[in-house]
């Protein structure tokens, strides 16, 4: 192989010498136009041509072509040696994972908020010894262990960490490995602040938009907010705990799908919910997109009635009106309303987004990268939706690790609208990390895309993370040898 390259190099070196001589003769020729002469001079000064590179020694050729690769890392020889974790109190309980290698570099990922870190730990035995730069290969090995919502947390967390590692190994940002970027900043959407009085809420909204700089907001419009109004709901007391979507228990309201609760909204209830939106819209104005979410577990007909009552407020979208699996119901709602519909935060893999996209059952898809499959799979989801004329917003509720993974994916996906930030009012959230290129994590409602920082472009500030470990598990990236042994045959076909 070496002798072949050297023969090619010798031949190209001779051609380069002839090309250089001919170029100089044309530059010196008085008949050559100034524009042509300037162009020829620039080609001579603009860097090494392919033939020039081939004219180098074999060793110099390798050095030139791998000049961006970190010298302390040999990507082709990287091997995964460990997977460790810590659990933070971000959004109650969110785990960060770290994948270590034989060359001292590591990658950071995140198991989705509320998910068990064991979703990631059980994958360790499947990836030990693998080269982390073979991201797609490893993803295909482990994706069978993912599922909807938090069940995908382990697979997606590992995938995030692999892109962080790969970017560090090749000294390029993760977005570059996804094919390049469409934008230098990523627009963020945030929740509308809640308050006890309209005057206080107006003050908080102005702070959110004018001081913090957020130009896209989202509010909750829940039947839980009208449950105490007499005559607002039919069948409101069937569930003893009320109508909170956060209840536990398998027979609770929260675990009863929308068509099966028997709860209906009366005209009085619709007026009350519309008034809630009217109040916020009047404070926000119409220059800022306003999205809505968390309506409650109501059936298809009540979703349409509520949507029509809110159409006049020109909302950016109605989110998750029914469970994502109910494609036909989503399509019926979408066709009945003027307001855009959206779902997707609990969907794993492109194949499960396709029914919604192919049937144009929603106007906007809304993957959560920590559930949808990680950076590359989420970009594929966005690209597929783009072909069908559907936009993509991104759900995100986690630490700065998943936040930055989303930023890289959003930068690399053309039909992107806005990225959710669920910890705007958590004062210590940004302090968990430092950016490796000195940029701000968030600047006036936008996330600057790391233009040169390798991988995800952030590192943990250990002493700060340790202040916010979950009391149920205060370990911090300790070895996990108990997860080294693989104990099953994983092939899914015979």
Predicted feature residues:
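Extended hydrophobic packing segments that form well-structured cores
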Residues: 456-494
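N-terminal secretory signal peptides
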Residues: 1-35
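Ligand-binding pocket scaffold of soluble enzyme catalytic domains
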Residues: 108, 169, 203, 391-392
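Shared catalytic-loop signature of beta/alpha-barrel
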Residues: 125, 130-134, 308, 314-317, ...
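Structured beta-strand/loop patches that form or line metal/cofactor-binding pockets in enzymes
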Residues: 68-108, 112, 426-432, 494
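Metal-dependent enolase-superfamily TIM-barrel catalytic cores that perform enediolate-based chemistry
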Residues: 185-331
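Metal- or metallocofactor-binding catalytic centers and their adjacent structured scaffolds
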Residues: 102-175, 488-489, 493
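N-terminal twin-arginine translocation
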Residues: 32-41, 50-72
């Amino acid at each position: 192989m070496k002798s072949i390259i050297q023969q090619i190099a010798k031949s190209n070196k001779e051609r380069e010498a002839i090309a250089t001589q001919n170029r100089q003769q044309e530059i010196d020729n008085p008949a050559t136009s100034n524009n042509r002469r300037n162009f020829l001079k620039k080609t001579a000064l603009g860097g090494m041509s392919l033939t020039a590179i081939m004219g180098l020694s074999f060793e110099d050729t390798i050095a030139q072509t791998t000049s961006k690769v970190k010298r302390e890392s040999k990507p082709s020889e990287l091997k995964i040696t460990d997977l460790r974790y810590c659990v933070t109190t971000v959004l109650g309980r969110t785990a960060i994972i770290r994948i270590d290698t034989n060359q001292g570099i590591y990658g950071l990922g995140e198991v989705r908020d509320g998910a068990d870190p064991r979703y990631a730990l059980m994958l360790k035995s499947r990836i030990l010894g693998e080269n982390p730069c073979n991201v797609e290969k490893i993803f295909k090995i482990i994706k069978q262990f993912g599922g909807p919502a938090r069940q995908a947390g382990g697979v997606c967390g590992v995938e995030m960490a692999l892109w962080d590692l790969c970017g560090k190994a090749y000294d390029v940002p993760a977005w570059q490995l996804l094919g390049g970027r469409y934008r230098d900043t990523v627009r963020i959407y945030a929740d509308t602040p809640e308050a006890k009085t309209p005057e206080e809420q107006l003050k908080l909204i102005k702070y959110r938009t004018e001081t913090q700089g957020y130009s896209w907001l989202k509010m909750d419009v829940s039947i839980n907010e009208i449950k105490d109004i007499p005559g607002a709901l039919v069948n409101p007391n069937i569930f003893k705990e009320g109508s909170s979507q956060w209840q536990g228990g398998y027979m609770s309201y929260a675990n009863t799908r929308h068509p099966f609760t028997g709860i209906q909204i009366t005209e009085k209830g619709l007026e009350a919910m519309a008034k809630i939106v009217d109040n916020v819209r009047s404070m926000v104005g119409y220059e800022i997109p306003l999205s809505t979410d968390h309506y409650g577990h109501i059936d298809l007909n009540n979703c349409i009635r509520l949507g029509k009552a809110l159409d006049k407020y020109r909302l950016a979208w109605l989110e998750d009106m029914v469970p994502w699996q109910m494609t036909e119901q989503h399509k019926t709602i979408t066709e009945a309303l003027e307001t855009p519909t959206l779902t997707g935060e609990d969907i794993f893999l492109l194949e499960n987004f396709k029914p919604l996209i192919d049937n144009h059952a929603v106007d906007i898809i809304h993957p959560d990268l920590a559930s949808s499959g990680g950076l590359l799979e989420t970009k594929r989801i966005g690209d597929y939706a783009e072909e069908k004329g559907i936009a993509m917003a991104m759900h995100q509720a986690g630490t700065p690790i998943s936040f930055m993974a989303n930023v890289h994916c959003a930068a690399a996906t053309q039909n992107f609208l806005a990225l959710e930030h669920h910890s705007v009012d958590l004062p210590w959230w940004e302090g968990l990390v430092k950016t490796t290129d000195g940029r701000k994590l968030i600047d006036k409602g936008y996330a600057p895309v790391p233009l040169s920082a390798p991988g995800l472009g952030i590192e943990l500030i250990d002493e700060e993370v340790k202040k916010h470990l979950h009391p149920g598990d205060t370990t911090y990236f300790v070895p996990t040898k108990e997860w080294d042994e693989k104990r099953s045959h994983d092939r899914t076909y015979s």
